[in-house]
Regions:
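Conserved ABC ATPase signature
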Residues: 137-141, 145
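Conserved ABC ATPase "signature" region
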Residues: 67-68, 104, 108, 115-132
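Helix-to-loop junction immediately C-terminal to a conserved catalytic motif
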Residues: 52
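A short, proline-enriched helix->beta-strand linker immediately N-terminal to the Walker B motif
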Residues: 156-160
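ABC ATPase "signature
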Residues: 222-223
Length: 234
């Protein structure tokens, strides 16, 4: 579903240039839970932003569902992006909107009628186990609950791919386990391909089928989780 071919990304500053990614090639298959692991500053978040072309690679190609993103117009890219949802470390919820309205928000943007959006939002809140919090506000929720709302919101427009950028790193170990279990269930039930960006080995071991290790902008290793962790070269 995602092919990354020889992607490099160079950021040019006033006095220097930083090569954030150096010739990365990866295939992520439909239905995978794919972990991308590395220390902070290794280039993981840059890579994930290249996957939906929020960052354009300096060289190389990104192919999503047989479409080379570099050949698409801005309007076509927007269409592809509706199939790629994202959740973040800090949840990025709208604080002045209720939980229900947060989940409705992406549907409003694409013009879903209010009644249909609310119905779908309630179904999603049920999936993430927060139906009873529909009228609450983000400030009244725990970290784990906020991330559940963010997951419900990410699923609103039925994406095919879910990108998780350090989605559990602000959570305690028990809550992390619960969120990972939820992601696993969503992957199984809806066949959504999940890409998990993390610096935590335990997260990858818990739910990923495949893993890539990024080190200083380079692909140090990749393969199934069993392969990579049983013969660590890096």
């Amino acid at each position: 579903i995602i092919q990354i071919k020889n992607v490099t990304k160079t950021f040019i500053g006033k006095d220097n240039q930083v090569e954030a990614l150096k010739g990365i090639s990866l295939d992520i298959n439909k239905g995978d839970i794919y972990g991308i692991i590395g220390m902070s500053g290794a280039g993981k978040s840059t890579l994930v932003r290249c996957l939906n072309y929020l960052e354009k690679p300096t060289t190389g190609t990104v192919v999503v569902e047989d479409q080379d993103l570099s050949t698409l117009t801005e309007a076509e890219l927007r269409k592809v992006r509706t199939g790629i949802a994202m959740i973040f470390q800090h949840f990025n919820l709208l604080m002045q909107r209720s939980v229900l309205d947060n989940v409705c928000f992406p549907m409003e943007i694409v013009g879903v009628k209010k009644q249909a959006a609310r119905k779908r939002a309630m179904e999603l809140l049920e999936i993430v186990g927060l139906k009873e919090k529909a009228d609450a506000y983000p400030s009244q929720l725990s970290g784990g609950q906020k991330q559940r709302v963010a997951i419900a919101r990410a699923l609103a427009n039925t994406p095919k791919i879910l990108l998780c950028d350090e989605a559990t790193s602000a959570l305690d170990p028990t809550t992390t386990k619960e969120i990972l279990k939820l992601l696993q269930d969503i992957n199984k039930q809806y066949g959504i391909t999940i890409v998990i960006i993390t610096h935590e080995m335990a997260v990858v071991q818990e739910i990923c089928s495949h893993v890539a290790i990024i080190d200083a902008g380079e692909l140090a290793e990749h393969g199934t989780v069993e392969e990579v962790f049983s013969r660590p070269q890096s």
